[in-house]
A protein has these predicted regions:
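Bacterial N-terminal signal peptides
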Residues: 1-9
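Short, conserved catalytic-motif segment at the N-terminal edge
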Residues: 17-75, 98-100, 235, 357-362
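Active-site SXXK
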Residues: 22-29, 42, 48, 76-102, ...
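Short active-site loop at a secondary-structure junction
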Residues: 33-43, 63-124, 161-173, 245-248
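Structural recognition of the beta-strand scaffold that forms the well-ordered cores
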Residues: 41-43, 51-53, 76, 124-126, ...
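Short, surface-exposed loop or secondary-structure junction motifs
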Residues: 115-324
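Short, surface-exposed beta-strand/loop micro-motifs that present aromatic residues
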Residues: 249, 325-326, 332-345
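Generic C-terminus detector
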Residues: 354-379
């Protein structure tokens, strides 16, 4: 297992305000003890270094299954796909002038010009203000024969409210964004992202549709006929689309997600200082694009990213991250939060979706996420 990477300095910081196991171990292990997830990988750091990295528990509830390692254990990132692959691919295309944020989506996907959708822009999709419904219900998905039928259904959607009116967090927005990437770049999202983003960033453990040969080190997210299912995307829409979709399908290790977080903290710069994306383009994507309506419980949004306040009673971002913080979570049990004012990121990957023992595993995980974010903020402030 990868050794902990600790950056401890002399001083008077309290034990609860340090980047070490004394701070983080009880929080992550509590989630395992409560049955929210069988294992987890946590990485905390800054734009130029990792401050803490550790794996907890096992890939399944069996103690005989492999232990989690923050470098080699891969997780189904679920909706973290939206920000790591889809949003950032759009950021690259916008930066190059290939895609315009305020252009209608129909400029890139001509079929998306039905009643109500012709006025939806790329910015609307990224901010989740398109007015499209949240997703396709399971029964509706099952009735669709194949990926082509699913895309035709999405292309034929009618907004529930006029574009730009309010935030409706929607997988359909991300599916359409993946289609925009494919049409604008003339290649599938996974191919474009692998060459233009993952390779330059050195994300060697980040990919769609992981090969069978590495499935033994992928955290499972389901059970089929008594066997753990690993390496197959958990999201039903992404599965129907063949494992590559703008809303889900990406697999990665925690340290790769950390490298991506560092790229965002560097405002689009590679480790050697070269700009993969211009800083002004990154800043445009991180501006607050939509605020929650009072009383709706919806979250604030940047372009592609969740922002603070999150609109949650129990926030996955905790209570201490700065006002410019941005992040995202994934249904399978993944999360990433970045605080540019503190030069701080927190990556927590779990496989909560795998046979959780807790009755309310999602709520339990949100509590753990928030506590870890707050602990990281306190540790950062104490230095």
């Amino acid at each position: 297992m990868l050794a902990l990477v600790l950056l401890l300095q002399t001083g008077v910081a309290q034990p609860t305000a340090r980047f070490d196991g004394g701070t983080f171990d009880p929080l992550v292990e509590r989630g395992i003890l409560e049955g929210a997830y069988p294992g987890a990988a946590l990485v905390v750091g800054r734009r130029d270094r990792v401050l803490f990295a550790h794996g907890y528990g096992h890939l399944t509830w069996s103690a005989s299954s492999p232990r989690v390692d923050p470098e080699s254990t891969l997780y189904d990132l679920a909706s973290l796909t939206k920000v790591i692959a889809t949003t950032t691919s759009l950021m690259l295309l916008v930066d190059r002038g290939t895609v315009q944020l305020d252009a209608p989506v129909a400029a890139y996907v001509p079929e998306f010009d039905g009643p109500g959708t012709a006025g939806i822009t790329v910015r609307h999709l990224l901010a989740h203000t398109s007015g499209l419904r949240a997703d396709l219900p399971d029964a509706e998905l099952k009735a669709l024969r194949d990926s082509g039928a699913l895309m035709r259904r999405v292309l034929g959607e009618t907004p529930r409210v006029p574009p730009g009116r309010r935030v409706i967090y929607s997988d359909l927005n991300a599916i359409m964004l993946g289609e925009v990437v494919q049409r604008a770049s003339s290649e599938p999202l996974d191919v474009f992202a692998a060459r233009e983003l993952f390779a330059p960033l050195g994300l060697r453990e980040t990919r769609f549709r992981p090969p069978i040969r590495i499935r033994a080190r992928i955290a499972p997210t389901g059970v089929w006929r008594g066997h753990a299912v690993a390496g197959v995307v958990n999201d039903a829409s992404a599965f129907k689309l063949g494992g590559v979709s703008g809303n889900a399908g990406l697999f990665a290790g925690a340290l790769d997600v950390a490298r991506f977080a560092q790229f965002m903290l560097r405002e689009g710069a590679l480790p050697d200082g070269r700009q993969l994306v211009r800083a002004e383009t990154v800043r445009e994507f991180l501006k607050r694009a939509a605020a929650p309506e009072r009383g709706t419980g919806a979250e604030a949004r940047a372009l592609g990213w969740q922002a603070v306040p999150t609109g949650e009673t129990v926030s996955s971002a905790g209570t201490l991250l700065g006002p410019r913080s941005f992040g995202h979570t994934g249904w399978t049990g993944t999360s990433l939060w970045i605080d540019p004012d503190r030069n701080l990121f927190v990556v927590l990957l779990t496989n909560r979706a795998f046979a959780p023992r807790a009755r309310r595993s999602f709520t339990a995980l949100k509590t753990v996420r928030g506590q870890i974010a707050d602990a990281a903020a306190r540790a950062s402030d104490a230095r």
